[in-house]
Amino acid sequence: GGPTDIAVLSLGGKVKATSVRVAGNHYDEEILKFVRNKYSVAIGQRTAEELKKNVACCPQKTDFHETMEIKGRSLLTGLPVRVNVSTDDLYEPVMMLSEQIGTAAHQVLEKTPPELAGDIFRNGVMLTGGGAQLHGLTEYLSEELKVEVTVSPDPVNCVALGTAMSLGLNDKLETGFLDATPRIGRR
């Protein structure tokens, strides 16, 4: 994943925007480091991603408490080991990154012209991308920003779908096929 882009859009254009170097893979890296430091266990990227998807949560969602048994290699003995990692264990690494997103979103809203405040209250904030699926992120951001935050119905694909729609490729999306033949030199 690349950066997290945050923008206020109005009348088909960008009013205010910023990017932060926080994305799904950054959560994975922080979880990887956490497991290494707390348990002295090396895990792979896939295991870190599974922890993010199934166990990690922002703290506002207090009814979400999961534990997952993971397998890795002990950094002390070099042997395979099993460790149980809980939602509470992942609080710090998850919140460190979520707070960066919340702060950046807050700054964008602060710089947004006041005449758009009504639209923001009415329409709220829409989360897109894979990171939008992090448990509790919508609740956390809603609390931080004081507006409703929702996740796109198809957060992983909506950016690509929106781009295709803006390029007038809607009909190709419906059939599921798009001619991606390079058009270099053609008129």
Give names to the regions the model predicted.
Residues 139-165, 173:
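Conserved phosphate-binding/catalytic loops in two-lobed NTP-binding clefts
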